[in-house]
Each structure stands twice: as structure tokens, then as C-alpha cells.
Amino acid sequence: MTPNYTLQDIVEFLYSLDRDDLVRIVIDDAKNWLAHDGLWFQAVEAQHGMAAAIEADRVAWERFTVVEARRIMERLGMKPGGGIAALLECLKHRLYARLNPQELREVSEGRAVLVMRDCRVQSARKRKGLPDFPCKSVGLAEYAEFARTVDPRIQTRCIACPPDDHPRDQWCAWEFTIPSDEQRS
């Protein structure tokens, strides 16, 4: 007989675990999510080509990132409009933040720069001798919509992202700004 599990059973199971086990599950779930994203992309690419796969990926990320931002904000008890500080807090809670080393630079009330120090996708391609994956259009949709969901005043600019040239110690970098005339006093 196959056991049945309710959502409550699963929640109770998670509460029974110690902190280290929970952290391992969170990291492993993030890896599984990214593996699914990559396999999905490869399936679309195999059937429809790279350009179509990138466009489908861009559209999917544009939508997913809004869902992700809203859920993070709800979990943190945030409302839209919290500025750069709210964005930086939300970025720490993204699935990607559990997998890719990142750095925040030049943080102020009106500006921050996020640098992706390592990227599991790009590093895997490099290990396989493949060229950088040209993810700039996807990243721009992803980061712009995430930031705009956190605070509609935030504007996003890509500093560098493949296929752009980038320093060896980073894969991509994104600038988030709130125009000075829209900053709260």
C-alpha cells in the first residue's frame, strides 16, 4: 500500500528536522530548481533552436521573477515601495542567492550594484569547453521586473552580462537606481 501524505504531514516533517537538515534541503531544492530550468531550456533549444529558447526563457523569467519577488515580500512582510534597501533584502532571499556567490557594491539610498561573482550555469559551460551563454536579454527582464515589483521607482541597467565582455572575476553586474527626484526625504 502506498502511503498518503497531506501538506500538513510534510509541514510537520519539516518542523521535525534540525537546522542543518533544513539548510541542506533549501540548498538542494534550489539546485533542483535550476537543474529543471536548464533542462527545460535545452528541450526548447533542441526543438526550436537557440533564439526561440532564449526568447521563451526571457518571457518565462519576466513572469517568474514577479511571482518570486511578491512571495519574498509577503514572507518578509514588505509592501512595494521600500526603495533600494528593500530590494537588497529581497535579493538575499532569491533562489539564485542560494547558489551563486554575489557581491553588493556602491550601496546608497538611491543606488546599488549587484555583481554575480560566480554563476553555476556559466561555470558548467566553461568546464565543458562551451562559450558563455548569452543571457543578457533574459537577465535584463529578470532583474528589471524583480526590482520593479519591489519598488516601481527602481530602474535597472545591465553593466555587463554575456554576450558582453566581462571581468574574469564576475559573470554579470546590474545597477539599480532610483532617480533623485523620486527618492523620499
Identify the residue ranges that each predicted region occupies.
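N-terminal accessory segment detector
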Residues: 1-113, 120-138, 148-173, 179-185
